[in-house]
């Protein structure tokens, strides 16, 4: 796939569909050839998947293997970086999993955009 590959992450409790859609619309307007990936969780991940379906944007889901216990999330996050090879990250507000994802992405030298409600169009 040519174009921008965007990893989307954020909190499970973040259910602001309009906000997530508006911010991803901004990314799509700048990068019409894009694909996204997410971690398959409820909240932002699920909303990002819905957004991708509504906009015919290719989406890849990386579910965590929770049988691995507390390291499942960080291992899934590393897998998203290694296998999807994103060119950037959109990190919506979240908790420890989002913080781990952004730490790993920044350590890999990827740009991370952290949208906040004030950026809503």
Residue ranges and their predicted role:
Residues 2-6, 14-121:
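Acidic/glycine-enriched connector segments
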């Amino acid at each position: 796939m040519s174009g921008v590959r965007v990893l989307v992450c954020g909190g499970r409790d973040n259910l602001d569909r309009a906000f997530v859609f508006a911010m991803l619309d901004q990314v799509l307007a700048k990068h019409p050839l894009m694909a996204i990936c997410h971690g398959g969780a409820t909240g932002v991940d699920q909303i990002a998947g819905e957004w991708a379906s509504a906009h015919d944007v290719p989406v890849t889901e990386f579910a965590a293997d929770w049988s691995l216990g507390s390291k499942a999330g960080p291992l899934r996050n590393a897998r998203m970086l290694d296998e999807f090879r994103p060119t950037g990250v959109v990190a919506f507000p979240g908790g420890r999993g989002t913080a781990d994802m952004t730490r790993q992405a920044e350590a890999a030298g990827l740009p991370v955009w952290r949208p906040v409600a004030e950026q809503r169009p």
